[in-house]
Amino acid sequence: MEFQKFRTMHFPRDVYIGHDVLEHIVDVVGENSRNKNAIIVSGDLTYELAGRKVHDLLSTYGYEVHVFLAGNANYDTLERIEYESLDIQAGIVIGVGGGAKIDLAKKLAFDRKLPFVSVPTAPSHDGIASPRASLRRNGISYSEEGAMPIGVIADTAIMIKAPYRYLAAGAADVISNLSAVKDWKLAHRLKGEEFSSSAAAMSEYSAQEVLSQINEIKKYEESSVWLVTKNILASGTAMAIAGNSRPGSGSEHLFAHALEAAGVENMLHGEMCAMGTVISMYLHDENWQQIKEAFDNLGISIRSRDYGIEDEIVINALRTAHAIRPERYTILGESDMSYDAAVKALELTGII
């Protein structure tokens, strides 16, 4: 049989990570923008933290910079930005902020077929360097194809200013790759889903790097931001190799999205994934205790009551999480988990 397999992979061309690297935005935009018009998508706080400097640097070099300050990463916000930017003949889109602002920017860039540059202000999750965008509608998160960053500028001197909680959540999101890859292997074995061993290996490597150095992740340490961010970048690259989010999104992310759909709003994405990873590793009959201990060391609680979440919400989220993306097979199976089984798993792992 004639070999016909084909795949396209897009990777960041320019990656700057470290202390005071923000000024390299001029180099990255200069090499990749199609003209002298740039769009910045940011938020009120993150614009003051880094976006204004990006604006001023590019303006100094003759760029016409158009700034859009956005709220939550949902379809209404995306549609507003896309409508308001219709008349701008932009040559590049720059996302400055946390995960939500960067997701909006990468989706805008994808829809407009423009180069995209990611400038994260917090190492809160692996979306800062992946080609996937998470957008919400009616409280439910949907994973959309977005633009893979042509450039990433992760200035640790800026990112260290974010609350430690965001750093811990970013580390947890990378560690969650372990359960995601186990789900991917399961889907490959039972459902014949296409599997990339190289993408899986990179994803697992980034998770193990964080896990093995968990005690080095500390508050107010710029080196800790460096450690987590470089593995976030590796995790995003794994998704680019796979051509989908499988290397970093499995049952633990379905559980997190089920919590979001239930109206849980006072948890960060990485914190929800931490909770989901522990339960997923338990269901896979893996060493969930080691993962839970790592989250304890990060200062992340996986007890739902610590976030003011009622037990029934968590139980229902676990039972129905499989339905969030029914086409994505995981350890959660294809039908609702029994009530008693969900309670047993959640109680044994200490989540409820």
UniProtKB/Swiss-Prot annotation:
Keywords for the protein's UniProt record, in alphabetical order: Cytoplasm, Lipid biosynthesis, Lipid metabolism, Metal-binding, NAD, NADP, Oxidoreductase, Phospholipid biosynthesis, Phospholipid metabolism, Zinc
Gene Ontology terms: biological process: glycerophospholipid metabolic process; phospholipid biosynthetic process
Binding site for substrate: 126, 173, 257
Pathway listed: Membrane lipid metabolism; glycerophospholipid metabolism
Reactions accelerated catalytically: sn-glycerol 1-phosphate + NAD(+) = dihydroxyacetone phosphate + NADH + H(+); sn-glycerol 1-phosphate + NADP(+) = dihydroxyacetone phosphate + NADPH + H(+)
Co-factor binding details: Binds 1 zinc ion per subunit.
Name the UniProt record assigns to this protein: Glycerol-1-phosphate dehydrogenase [NAD(P)+]
Source species of the chain: Thermoplasma acidophilum (strain ATCC 25905 / DSM 1728 / JCM 9062 / NBRC 15155 / AMRC-C165)
